[in-house]
């Protein structure tokens, strides 16, 4: 097994199937993009929500007990908070 195959196998145990993940992630992102407030969001808010939706799909498709998924979500939310509070990000 080469390095790429090894990494993909390792990730599938925590992230689940890439195809399922892509489907769920895109579906979640469509919900956000259709929201009433999407157009008024900053690029920081939009990107953070995209990443949070991506992480949520990893939780629902993969291992929901993987601490890094939850830490990543908290990190993206914190970046938005800091941006809105005019703290350096």
PLM features per residue range, with description:
Residues 1-89:
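Intrinsically disordered, low-complexity regulatory regions
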């Amino acid at each position: 097994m080469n390095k790429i195959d090894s990494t993909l196998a390792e990730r599938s145990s925590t992230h689940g199937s890439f195809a399922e993940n892509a489907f769920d992630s895109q579906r979640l992102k469509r919900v956000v993009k259709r929201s009433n407030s999407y157009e008024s969001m900053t690029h920081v808010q939009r990107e953070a929500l995209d990443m949070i939706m991506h992480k949520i799909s990893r939780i629902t498709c993969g291992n929901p007990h993987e601490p890094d998924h939850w830490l990543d979500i908290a990190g993206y939310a914190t970046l938005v908070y800091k941006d809105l509070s005019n703290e350096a990000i």
